């Protein structure tokens, strides 16, 4: 009786059946597919049956830091792809640090991509951890991988796509990825007929002045870029995706965000300033800029759930002094991220959300600016707000107390306001706590919960 047959009845020291040993090889390989390759290889010491089983796992998930020598890493990938070369490959995940001394050899990646395309790979995830060298240009064969479902690339350069056939591609993440020409990205997006999720993280030097995202199937779009106030550019992002449900924008450099036929967005995460800054300030006389901001706000006005940053609120506040804001009638959940800006622009936006039920104030960093804390003029009641949570620990500063007062004194049906005190403030016999609890409340059923 061989060792596997001896082990299959019961686990050591237990009365439970060892079901793992009863599983067929094909199912074990599917289980191992979910582990990093370095851990999969370790199973080879379990028994004779497991000795070569890892070689049949239909996927590779490897980091060059798993190897002491970079050449060993390269040889391992070569050997793995050569073994059982006629079988299909479900995933190919590779992370490497492309140092200068390895440059000649790292171009093997192009050959590996050609190989896995012929093996009908479904998921490609390649990360150049040197982050921004763009040494490696992937071959054009990647554009004709008809089995490909997800493509995630970081720090690489893509060839200009002359022909694209990606009928199965649903997810594409391009992180600090460059194209051989400025039309390459637009062409690639347009030629993916079932693309549902697109994430683009841009570098300050990608040289794409106008990025057009045109997709009839896209449901989720994320656009992120590093911020550099010293860069004054007329960059444009134009989005034409009528089925879009989720939108995340985090880019202070782009001057114009254009939403064409936005459909009905459900959720958005917005941190943009339309390239406005302390140097390049909002100009009420710049009518094209005002029109663009107005159309953008109208485009996102259908959302139900939104995260918005104080930098964006400041632009909205400046815009509101020229024009009336559109109503966000569907918005029921709002999370506001404050970073170093006064909250005085918040009431203006809240009053444009007539059906808002939940407000979360996160990471607020309040600033004192004299006594002019509340916006001048009468404020409208918040007739729908039911729940408020202030996540930043309060210290009792005037700005904080004004925020709490505004919410309690203007919310007609507020049920609960949750906050917490800073560790430097003792809850017992706290003057701040007494002040908070003494604030008049418009809603008779509201509770203040101090965590």
UniProtKB/Swiss-Prot annotation:
Residues 370-421 form the FBD domain. LRR repeats lie at residues 128-155, 177-202, 224-251, 335-363. Pfam families: F-box (PF00646), FBD (PF08387), LRR_At5g56370 (PF24758). It comes from the Eukaryota. Keywords: Leucine-rich repeat, Repeat. Residues 17-70 form the F-box domain. PANTHER family: F-BOX/RNI SUPERFAMILY PROTEIN-RELATED, PROTEIN WITH RNI-LIKE_FBD-LIKE DOMAIN. This is F-box/LRR-repeat protein 13. It comes from Arabidopsis thaliana.
